[in-house]
Amino acid sequence: MSTFGGPGTAARDDLAQDFVAFAVEAGVLRFGEFKTKAGRLSPYFFNAGLFDDGAKLGRLAEFYARRMQASGLAFDMIFGPAYKGITLAAAVAIELARLGRNLPYAYNRKETKDHGEGGSLVGAKLHGRVVIIDDVISAGTSVRESVAMIRAAGAEPCGVAIALDRQERATETTQDGVRDADHSAVQFVQRELGLAVCAIATLSDLLQYLARQADPALAQHLPRVQAYRDRYGV
């Protein structure tokens, strides 16, 4: 189960299972050997940039909206950090409006504009309780920057909605070099920034999906994904 406040339990989460199946079918979630930003060799890779047509993006927005509505989190508007978060925020705002909840949204530019309306923020004025929407939380940098912008505008960041929680230990730099932390990037955001984190699905959900597969082409990946979780998971 993938809800606000934690990575979930072993109970089956139908929304998460449907999302994992969708991501696999869309080619967004792939299996093989992939090098992560932390330098680890991961047996799977999630690339939200491959939700690259109207149908895929619309369905992705449905998953976000359903998870957010079920979360119980109260929020007044949506914020999408540049760059991937911009499209996600717009798509989710459209889907929520379709479901009867019309909320404002905003996003930031990475380059401050010095003409026209100027500034780095675009869209509705930030106000009230703001939920941040992104694809994943890798190091928490984007979330920290978003929190600073939202607070500087006088609004309150209240949570982060993401597509996938990898549930793996973050890395941290010490005087002896880079080492694995005892927490994930999502846990850092929860503990240090005080924000609820909502994931449509988690690594636990992916493992459940693989364990249920009758297709050997998919089931064969379960041992490697489980071994990765055993080594780097939280």
From Swiss-Prot:
Orotate binds at F45, F46, S138, R166. Pfam families: Pribosyltran. Gene3D superfamilies: 3.40.50.2020. It catalyses: orotidine 5'-phosphate + diphosphate = orotate + 5-phospho-alpha-D-ribose 1-diphosphate. Transmembrane segments: none annotated. Its EC number is 2.4.2.10. Its cofactor is Mg(2+). GO terms for molecular function: magnesium ion binding; orotate phosphoribosyltransferase activity. PROSITE patterns: PUR_PYR_PR_TRANSFER (PS00103). 5-phospho-alpha-D-ribose 1-diphosphate binds at residues 37, 83-84, 109-110, 113, 115, 134-142. Pathway: Pyrimidine metabolism; UMP biosynthesis via de novo pathway; UMP from orotate: step 1/2. Keywords: Glycosyltransferase, Magnesium, Pyrimidine biosynthesis, Transferase. It comes from the Bacteria. InterPro entries: OPRT, Or_phspho_trans_dom, PRibTrfase_dom, PRTase-like. Catalyzes the transfer of a ribosyl phosphate group from 5-phosphoribose 1-diphosphate to orotate, leading to the formation of orotidine monophosphate (OMP). HAMAP family: PyrE. Belongs to the purine/pyrimidine phosphoribosyltransferase family. PyrE subfamily. Homodimer. NCBIfam families: pyrE. PANTHER family: OROTATE PHOSPHORIBOSYLTRANSFERASE 1-RELATED. This is Orotate phosphoribosyltransferase. It comes from Methylibium petroleiphilum (strain ATCC BAA-1232 / LMG 22953 / PM1).
